[in-house]
Amino acid sequence: MAMRLYSFLKDKSIISSDAFIVGNVVDVYYEPGSWTVRSIGVRGSKGLGDVLGASSFRKPQFSLNIGTYDINDVILIPEARDQLQKALVADNGGTEKATVLIGKKVVTSDLITIGTIADIGIDLDTWRINSFKVKIEKGVAEALDVKLGLINKTVSGLLTSHISSVTDGVNLSRRVEDLRGNFTLD
């Protein structure tokens, strides 16, 4: 399982197989019910409009299909410059931007705010969001059995299976005591 945080992917350059700079990652689009990532939002590089036949755009934004990519310092996609049209995804609705989750309050089923979403964990083998980093509220750290550091207040361990709904906040299906011991300090 190749886990990466959204912060690792954000602004990463996307390069075609013939070394053309396609653009940079701006977001990840996921299906709310299944947490499956459907596409990567890209801010296109200068000159990409000509390649895609949309020369009126200076820096087009579009989405790329999910695939098997080599991801290290850059994201290398298998398509060459003249094949980029095949990699594009039309916006068919039904997906949400993952970055909308960052900063949302996390509330337990017993209506206690435990913190805010700080980052998103994505399994790159299955292209599924499966966990979150949470900036913990000072008052609930002890109840969650988390010893916060002086500087670091972010923990890992909130799974998508703990979430009942996402509205103005992230609503959990678990109470505070059910979450005790699930988190590890980053």
Regions found by a protein language model. Give the residues of each.
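Peripheral interaction segments used for macromolecular assembly
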Residues: 1-186
